Structure formats: C-alpha cells, structure tokens
Regions:
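Histidine/cysteine-enriched polar flanking segments
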Residues: 1-182
Length: 182
C-alpha cells in the first residue's frame, strides 16, 4: 500500500500514523491530527491531560513523528499544537440547530474539535475556535511556528469560531479547497 501511495502522490516517502481522533465520522482524517508546515517541519495535536478523550492518540502521533525521518533520512522538527482544554460537546440547542436527517455525532460524544484543522492561505492561517480557554493559545502557537519556520510576519494567523462546522463532522480545512496563487 505504501509504495502504491508514494507512486500515486509522486512522493518519496509516506509517514503513517496509527490512528486519528475520529474513527467514526471521518475515519480519522490526518488534517485533525498533524500537518506539515514546511519540508521537515510538522505540527501535531497535543494534550497533557490523561483524562482527555484523545490523549492516547495525541501521544501516539507525536511519538510516531518524533521518531520519523524525511525521505532523505533527516529527523523531523515536531511542534505541539494544544487541543482545546475541555473536550467540545454539543448542547441540546446546538444539536437541534443542525438540519440533518441523521446527525453525525451524538450529544454525549466529544466533537472532533482540533485546532489542527485550520486553513492555510497564501499568507495566513484561519484557525478554528471553540469558545475555549486554549483558543488564543492555539492561534499564538501557530503564529510562533509559522514565524520561526517562514520568517516573522510572512503569515498571519487568526481565529474564527467554527463550532457549527465541527458539529457537522469536519472543520475549516475539511470544508475548503485550498489553491495557492503560485
């Protein structure tokens, strides 16, 4: 499978993570878990809270990436992007606001609220926000990562409330089709 995927994508190496954070709705899309910022530079989701619903996946993904190399055998530089401090759950009012025949997630299940599912534009990042205390930290962390990687001021990271999007089973990166100008 790996060789076929490498040929199909025209890449020299694929790095596999064991499990994403949403096996039920999206089959664990990688855009909720990790993203390459530049060649050899990757960010992944992180929490220190062992009671967080996706604690195990965060740590497994981080371990996979810090032990991985790029196609030329070089170690990756891995940044940690925090998860929301509190898992995101849908209220009854929010559940009733979604016009779906079969809602994607139940109210008692944690939503796949990850700051990683952000949109990169030509010189900016649009970062999901959930009304959580870590919202500002996520934007600041991504801004720092992009400044360190590409130079200060090349990218501008901003937050946008995306709770209604996440309740439908995706987020900003999922619902957009990125096409850079160059």
């Amino acid at each position: 499978m790996t060789k076929e995927l490498e040929e199909y994508l025209g890449v020299e190496k694929v790095i596999w993570v064991k499990e994403g954070i949403d096996p039920e709705v999206t089959n664990g899309h990688i855009d909720d878990c990790a993203t390459f910022i530049a060649p050899g530079v990757v960010a992944c989701i992180w929490t220190d809270d062992p009671d967080y619903p996706f604690y195990r996946q965060c740590h497994e993904i981080y371990d996979t990436l810090v032990n991985a190399t790029d196609a030329k055998g070089r170690k990756l530089k891995v940044y940690k992007l925090p998860m929301p401090e509190k898992p995101c759950f849908m209220s009854e009012e929010e559940a009733n606001s979604i016009d779906l025949v079969n809602p994607r997630t139940a109210q008692d299940e944690p939503q796949i609220a990850s700051y990683m599912n952000y949109l990169v534009t030509n010189h900016g990042c649009i970062v999901p926000q959930y009304g959580d205390v870590n919202d500002a930290l996520a934007v600041e962390t991504l801004q720092k990562i992009y400044d360190e990687t590409w130079g200060e001021g090349v990218f501008k990271c901003v937050g946008v409330d995306s709770r209604q999007v996440v309740y439908g089973g995706g987020n900003i990166h999922c619902i957009t089709q990125q096409e850079p100008s160059a």
